[in-house]
């Protein structure tokens, strides 16, 4: 049977720092009680974090997730105000107004809202 949920796993060098970073952006964030793994939630979306201390030596180990949001511009402003690296949303030929958040480990959250 096929499930109804998907959660991308972002590799991170320092789990505690990554959890704090995402908390600062408005995510719910908690560490798995066994350590080495964490969970983020944001408006019904879940992203997992997996600790990989040697991540800096593996540039091929990055992940991307896409968030469908109501207002990409408002989200970009909020994340920029929190100090995040954000590429401001732009209109795309496929009808989305999209931006990109790049976390300190190089993982990306692309986010977009429908163009008017």
Language-model segments: what does each one mean?
Residues 40-45, 101-104, 114:
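Active-site beta-strand termini and strand-to-loop segments that position acidic
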